[in-house]
Amino acid sequence: MTTFTDTEKVFLELYKAGVWGEIAHKDVLVGKHIDWKAVLGMAGKQAVVGNVSDGISLLRETEMPQPLKMKLITYVLTVRKNNETMNAAIPEIYRLLEDIGVVPVLLKGQGVAQNYRAPLSRQSGDVDLYIPDTQQIAEAYKLCQQNMKMIEPLTTDTMEAVFQYRHVVVELHGRINAYVNKTLERRFPAWCDAMFREEKERKVCIGGGFAVLPSLRLDLVFVFVHLTRHYFGGGIGLRQIADWMRLLYAHHADIDQEQLMRDVTYLGIEKIWKVFAAMAVDFLGYPKDKMPLYNERYADMGKQVLRYVLDSGNFGYHDVRTKSKSKNYYVRRCKAFTGNMSKILRNFFMFPHETIYNIPGYLKSGIKRTRF
């Protein structure tokens, strides 16, 4: 039976309050000793400190120790500052690329942040720019080499390169990878290309300039595919789930639900969507009437997925099954291997196809990272 501790319940209530702007349930917060250090620790592991802080701000009063309050304030100010830095950099990057006739598509990140109640509270990551044209990405790569610090060179197999621009990590993508299951891997590239040809991209204001986002139809699928790819590949935090929920919520009136149903079915991710939809509605506060493809039959699976998310943390970095205090390198690698295999296999009874599909990739990646 899947259960949550009292501290986890408090954390989830504050997370929901921050994401949706609703006061947390008093029966969870009132009359109980709250381990604020543990709550904020969970928020850090899930990369949602800003959201939880927003939730705490809605409380009339808290008994949080003053040192923790100061630590929280400092962290939140850093999150906001990082967002402001990234928002200022994006228009500059667009202007650089526009000078050579390249207009990239901004994926995830600061684009989905626009859907939040408080965009600056979202913990930022990288600037991901998609440039599908082979010649254009080569030109953009050359320009970035001249104006940015290169972290990783362009690779022909993944068509990705990584740079640093004014303390902001910038990733160029010439291809969108969708390694979740065989159906998605086979169908997504052509479907994605069709979306860029047929659907209108969106232009948004960021940092006093502009950025181009994918069409809504594509973004709804891409953001979900991205989070499920990381879920099956190692783990995700509630930040990625908040990105997806806020995207759906902000645009629910414009979503063609029948078209979305056809898309996720064609791409082989219908069941995964329904499980995550049940998790969002039944445990994370998403309004039931605004969730596409919600089915209460998947509530137990949704609860189990939430349990896994809490156990693993952002990108799976905080899962204790992968950690070892041994000074021996090979003992640590063995612990990481068995722990990560356990994380992958835990999904087998819910998602057998995705579990089996992801094992070879994990083994290949693990061998590549191991020193012999």
Residue ranges of model-derived segments:
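Conserved NTP-donor binding/palm subdomain of two-metal-ion nucleotidyltransferases/polymerases, i.e.
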Residues: M1-G125, I131-F372
